Structures are given as C-alpha cells and as structure tokens.
C-alpha cells in the first residue's frame, strides 16, 4: 500500500550547499523531517552540478515523516544571466537594457528547460524564454 502524502515543500537550494541553517533547517524541522538526511542526500545528488547553482526542489512529505525529493532544472533567470554575462537584470525593463542574448542561446536554454516547462514544442519554449528575457530587461538579438 502506498504511503499517505501529508504535504509538499518547495525550496530553492544552491547545488552542493544544503545545510541545516535557514531556510532549509526551519522549513524541514517544523514538518518533523530529518534535516541532515535531506542535506546529505541533496548534496550527494548535486555533486556533479556546478557549486552554488540554484536548484529548485519539491519535497514530498509522508505521514510517517519520511520524504522524497525531486530536483528541477535551475531557474530560467539563472540561465539567461549566464548567457548575457550579467549579474542581474535591468532595474527598469523595457527602458534600459541589461544585456543581450542571441536566438541560439534562447534555443539552448529552451532545450535545457523543456522538461520543466508546460509546452510541447521547442518553439513554444523559446517564446517563454524570450518573454522572461524581456521581463528581465535583456534584448533578444536576431
């Protein structure tokens, strides 16, 4: 018989840097989960990923206080900032440009994010990436 799910918890944790300090410790602790068990398992799974890459995680919490977690791909803004080689987006998107990304870079990001996006084609995913780029104040060049 399947375990009874009591809830889900969404966190964004830097790769290889999960530790019991806030925000991870309190979020897991108040739900009665073993914090160190999560930290060790997460850090083991993110060994091959570049350090401090933000990884969204969905933790499924069961009635017996056990858990499983699923890692997603890093946020689109992370990939866009890397591609444009900027630290942050524009403070006034639409007026000031923070940088540029090419269509090839947009396609590459769309292909990486495809499994986490709610679209069927790469072209639809590219439109989502372009929209995110524009909202960050990045220009999409030819």
Swiss-Prot record:
Entries under InterPro entries matching the protein: Ribosomal_uL11, Ribosomal_uL11_bac-typ, Ribosomal_uL11_C, Ribosomal_uL11_C_sf, Ribosomal_uL11_CS, Ribosomal_uL11_N, Ribosomal_uL11_N_sf
A molecular function (GO) term: structural constituent of ribosome
PTM text: One or more lysine residues are methylated.
GO cellular component terms, semicolon-separated: cytosolic large ribosomal subunit
Record SUPFAM superfamilies: Ribosomal L11/L12e N-terminal domain, Ribosomal protein L11, C-terminal domain
Keywords recorded for this protein, A-Z: Methylation, Ribonucleoprotein, Ribosomal protein, RNA-binding, rRNA-binding
Gene Ontology terms: biological process: translation
Function: Forms part of the ribosomal stalk which helps the ribosome interact with GTP-bound translation factors.
Subunit structure: Part of the ribosomal stalk of the 50S ribosomal subunit. Interacts with L10 and the large rRNA to form the base of the stalk. L10 forms an elongated spine to which L12 dimers bind in a sequential fashion forming a multimeric L10(L12)X complex.
PANTHER family cross-referenced by the UniProt entry: 60S RIBOSOMAL PROTEIN L12, LARGE RIBOSOMAL SUBUNIT PROTEIN UL11M
Family: Belongs to the universal ribosomal protein uL11 family.
HAMAP family (UniProt xref): Ribosomal_uL11
Name by which UniProt lists this protein: Large ribosomal subunit protein uL11
Organism of this sequence: Afipia carboxidovorans (strain ATCC 49405 / DSM 1227 / KCTC 32145 / OM5)
Gene that encodes the chain: rplK
């Amino acid at each position: 018989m399947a375990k009874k799910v009591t809830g889900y918890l969404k966190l964004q944790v830097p790769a290889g840097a999960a530790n019991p300090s806030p925000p991870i410790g309190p979020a897991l602790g108040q739900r009665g989960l073993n914090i160190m068990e999560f930290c060790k398992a997460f850090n083991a799974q993110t060994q091959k990923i570049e350090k401090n890459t933000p990884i969204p995680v969905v933790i499924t919490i069961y009635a017996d206080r056990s858990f499983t977690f699923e890692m997603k791909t890093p946020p689109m803004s992370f990939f866009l900032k890397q591609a444009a080689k900027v630290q942050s987006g524009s403070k006034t998107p639409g007026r000031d440009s923070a940088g540029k990304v090419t269509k090839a870079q947009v396609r590459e990001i769309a292909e990486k994010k495809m499994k986490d996006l709610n679209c069927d084609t790469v072209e639809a995913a590219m439109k989502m990436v372009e929209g995110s780029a524009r909202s960050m104040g990045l220009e999409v060049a030819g």
